[in-house]
């Protein structure tokens, strides 16, 4: 990235600058908490005071009575670190969005400007994304709401269940008036209320062993699975294997069963462990483990009749679900906006309620995995 002598620069409004002594400056990104500490000359420190969004590099050089090219390497560096913004490039970037979207996503664009290349350009990646969500329970519906607020406008929603009274404890879309209605319909209506430009394709059906997933994934570029019927391991394996074949990123969301503050995991074909790598890991680490449930026997019929409330549920809080929802959404947004250039993938972790620390599993790609080892 080369400075142009006639280019006009401004300081990123999300960056605070602190002078430390005579030859040190710290740049602090308010939004991302990133810090850059530099040992620089008093001349370069002085040059920063003339950056106002109107002066060119030549103008600053003339004011300081020095050759502007002496400042160029320093300005190039700050431009690359997003401390400085090129006004012309910013105008071009903002032209990518309609004014209504610039106004709506103003704060988000400011955040993206510090974290990625081009604030408005980053926002367009969300507006263009086509996201599939399997399962619209507390976690799946919550992720849908947050993605809609962030700017995703194309959803494919799959869930065969109806809203039940038990949903009131954790579902952020719950209303007593909605009990008995299909979750896909309820979620789609909420999304449209957030943004009338959102389009949702709805499938009120369960995922069975013989279900063909092709119709759900045909036009998608990001897949989310929160479907825990019959159980999350089965649905994730079935969906995950197809995602590897189609080179589609998959997020298996947390918040299920006894893992109500799970981070979930981002699965990128060829880069991270796949679902089968996780299954292999658990097969090894949990070998011989047999849980004992201290609850009285419950008639089998209660579990076999879909749509009925069941007397026993693993305990949890709506706020615990919100943690899993928000962690998943941030990870998904990062993948979409960075166009897959994710710097760090932490894998599955769990936030412990007592001390709020997150413990991550050390799951590696299995070199003998029958699904992803050939990638």
Give the role of each language-model region.
Residues 1-375:
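Adenine nucleotide-associated cytosolic modules
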